[in-house]
Structures are given as C-alpha cells and as structure tokens.
Design a protein with these regions (language model features):
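Glycine-rich anion/phosphate-binding loops
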Residues: 33-38, 94-108
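N-terminal beta1-alpha1-beta2 module of alpha/beta enzyme domains
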Residues: 1-81, 85-86
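Glycine-rich "substrate-gating" loop/helix at the edge of Rossmann-like oxidoreductase active sites
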Residues: 63-66, 91-97
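Conserved beta-strand positions in the central sheet of alpha/beta enzyme cores
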Residues: 55, 118-120
C-alpha cells in the first residue's frame, strides 16, 4: 500500500461558505504568505512521517484551494523535500496553452527533482 498526503490549502479568512468565483478583494498578501508557508510545511512533513507521495492540484478563484499553479507548488516542494514523490494531481490542460509547454515544464520539474514527479491531468 502507498500513502499520499494532500492538502487543498484553503483560504481560512472567510466567515461563511462562499460561492465560486471567490473574489480576490478578500485576499490579504501577508496572510496568504503565512498560509503558503504553513501549508508547504505541512506537505513537507509528509516526507518526515513516511508518506510515499505528496500531492498538489489546481484550483482557480476558490476559497477552498490556494493553488492556481500546481507546477509552482511542486517546484517549491522539490526544494523543501529530499526523497518523496511529488504528485501533480492535475494541470488543467485547456488553461495551460500549448501542451508542449506543459510537457516541457513537467520534464524540467522531473529533472530538477531527480525523477520524483508523478503527473496527471484533469479536464477542467
């Protein structure tokens, strides 16, 4: 059995459930910075406790997911971890432009991580 750690990275500063799209008027960059560091630390901890993979995904204009770019999150995790597989659970291909660009980015990430990238795709 393999164990994957995953975190949606929600925006915690909402008082009630909100509909999509979530307005960026309520986004505070200082709180955002703190949340990203905290959430990345939680994902980094997955390696320390023995998980096989850590997963990141893509959500836009949503209070329940602060990850519009899973490739950027994977890049940060490459630098913060040593051996754990980094699962990119979905680049939304229609939003990414040309598929060659996505393939090249994933190839770069896999090379920089010494083969630790596992990637999937979603339709949107």
């Amino acid at each position: 059995m393999r164990v994957v750690g995953f975190h949606l990275m929600p925006w915690t500063e909402v008082e009630h459930a909100v509909a999509w799209p979530f307005s960026d008027d309520e986004f505070d960059p200082e709180i955002g910075h703190e949340l990203y560091e905290d959430y990345l630390g939680q994902l980094e901890l997955c390696e320390d406790v023995g998980f096989d993979m850590v997963g990141v995904n893509e959500h836009h204009y949503s209070s329940y997911g602060l990850m519009p770019s899973p490739n950027l999150m994977a890049s940060r995790l490459i630098d913060r971890t040593d051996d754990i597989t980094i699962g990119i659970m979905g680049n939304i291909l229609p939003l990414r432009g040309h598929p060659v660009r996505v393939a090249e980015e994933l190839s770069m990430l896999d090379t920089m991580s010494d083969g630790r990238i596992c990637s999937g795709f979603v339709r949107g």
